[in-house]
């Protein structure tokens, strides 16, 4: 009975982590991301510092991020991959900032073998490091995971483009969501925010 209870407890923890990762991860503001990034740089955990930059700027899931080698990203203008979850082919443009950051971190990390995987931690360990780091810098959000980076990047693009519906639809396509309702929940767009759109009709014709 003890073995069964322990096994059940393990399953519960695994399911809880999966729920946080896939459904309800909190997004982080750019200020919170900067604080978290500085925390890992101070600890000289450059793998985690780069993960924050990479995940935020590419909107990729950890299952895809964890497959990249240095050779596949350094001095590249595009990333080519088949998404592990969806099986869909993706072409992701590497912006000038990310391109420069990859070179910078490669040097800081003492030029690893080009065939080395960049992000070597397991998903579980990575999530624990993110959660511990967040607490260490005073971020009080409880549902932080690798998925928070993807969600934060998507939310940032949406807000930077004045919550444009055109940009929203493009972000939804990038995220490969089944429908726009999923994307609205994902970006944390509330019913109140949707209702506020109608305030634009407060004009006299």
How would you name each of these model-derived features?
Residues 73-75, 164-187:
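Short, polar N-cap/turn motifs at the start of nucleic acid-interacting alpha helices
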Residues 24, 93-97, 164, 188-205:
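DNA/chromatin major-groove-contacting recognition/catalytic segments
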Residues 28-58:
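Basic, Lys/Arg- and aromatic-enriched nucleic-acid-binding interface segment
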Residues 86, 175-200:
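Catalytic-site neighborhood detector that most strongly recognizes the C-terminal catalytic loop/helix
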């Amino acid at each position: 009975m003890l073995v069964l209870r322990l096994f059940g407890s393990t399953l519960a923890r695994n399911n809880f982590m999966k729920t946080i990762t896939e459904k309800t991860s909190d997004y982080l503001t750019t200020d919170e991301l900067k604080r978290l990034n500085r925390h890992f740089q101070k600890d000289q955990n450059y793998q985690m510092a780069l993960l924050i930059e990479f995940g935020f700027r590419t909107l990729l899931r950890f299952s895809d991020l964890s497959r990249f080698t240095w050779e596949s990203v350094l001095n590249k203008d595009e990333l080519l991959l088949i998404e592990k979850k969806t099986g869909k082919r993706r072409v992701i443009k590497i912006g000038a900032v990310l391109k420069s950051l990859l070179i910078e971190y490669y040097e800081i990390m003492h030029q690893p073998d080009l065939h080395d995987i960049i992000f070597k931690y397991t998903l579980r360990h990575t999530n624990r490091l993110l959660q511990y780091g967040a607490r260490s810098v005073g971020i009080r959000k409880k549902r932080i995971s690798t998925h928070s980076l993807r969600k934060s990047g998507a939310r940032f693009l949406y807000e930077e483009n004045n919550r444009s519906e055109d940009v929203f639809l493009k972000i939804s396509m990038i995220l490969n969501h089944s429908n726009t309702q999923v994307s609205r929940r994902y970006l944390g767009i509330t019913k109140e925010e949707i209702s506020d759109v109608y305030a634009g009709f407060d004009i006299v014709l």
